Amino acid sequence: MIDQAIAAPLAAALTAKGYETLTAVQQAVLAPEAQGRDVLVSAQTGSGKTVAFGIAIADQILAGQDKLLYADSPLALVIAPTRELALQVARELEWLYASAGAQIATCVGGMDYRSEKRALDRGAHIVVGTPGRLRDHIDRKSLDLSGLRAAVLDEADEMLRMGFIDDVERILQETPDSRQTALFSATMPSAIKRIAK
């Protein structure tokens, strides 16, 4: 039985995908003390963390609605260390948020910049991308994060290891202080804990 605390569109998507129970990391983000708050989660690849952060940010994105309206600027941002992971995350969020009508844009190196800009201009609710390409869109004024409600840092320890932390911090400076932050990392180095604050 899927938890009653999950937003209805997401619960329907999980049920349609055959989910009967949630993983430990997915249950953790539903805990009352985690609702609407910043979360720092130690999670390995394969633990169901993409669905977990999709659930964690749902209240911020949906704001009590079952369907999303047009968004002038993104409501949620997911930063991932690699193009492959970003594309995988986008695919997962697409089915999870499909019945809510979420428009998801992917911004990653090696892809056509103009296509990404068009997707952003059409009103993306969720943007998934890599640090360098996201920063490029910010610098070119094609990505406005002023209305962001939630930010997710996926595999934050990998971003640290790959030297992306300065880009991540610069991206987060463009977002409102009131945003919810969900940070997922297999390990928790001190630099990761600093970003979480």
In which residue ranges do the predicted regions lie?
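Hydrophobic beta-strand core positions in alpha/beta domains
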Residues: 54, 78-80, 128, 161, ...
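Post-DEXD/H (motif II) to motif III coupling segment of the RecA-like Helicase ATP-binding lobe
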Residues: 144-197
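Conserved nucleic-acid-binding Ia/Ib motif block in the N-terminal RecA-like helicase ATPase lobe
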Residues: 3, 9-12, 19, 69-139, ...
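Short hydrophobic/aromatic beta-strand immediately N-terminal to the Walker A/P-loop
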Residues: 40-42, 77, 182
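Walker A/P-loop NTP-binding motif
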Residues: 27-39, 50-70, 87, 92-96, ...
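Conserved pre-motif I regulatory segment
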Residues: 1-42, 154
